């Protein structure tokens, strides 16, 4: 058990290991990835977003990025290329996708999507296709 507030958690299982990703709002590094072998005892394995390099306000140099950082992320594992995918929206403006071959990292930014996919879910289908489902009043895939 970790004494921490991990909001918007997404849990996946890869083999016999469980991984969870969470929102971190304004903290850097962001999007912690937790690891558990029993769903009770958890440890921090890494961070999907190594640094919040999304603008000066995240450096706390006179601007304020509080509660404008990482929200509502999703984590997936793609067995075909042995890669973890992290998807999350930042600053209510864009969606970012990061990848790594191990949850400990290194994680790197794969792409940026110009729309904020809030509360999105990332799915690797049985045919190896990647899907993102998101929405509020309406759902999109």
Label each region the model flagged.
Residues 1-141:
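Carbohydrate-active catalytic/glycan-binding domains of CAZyme proteins
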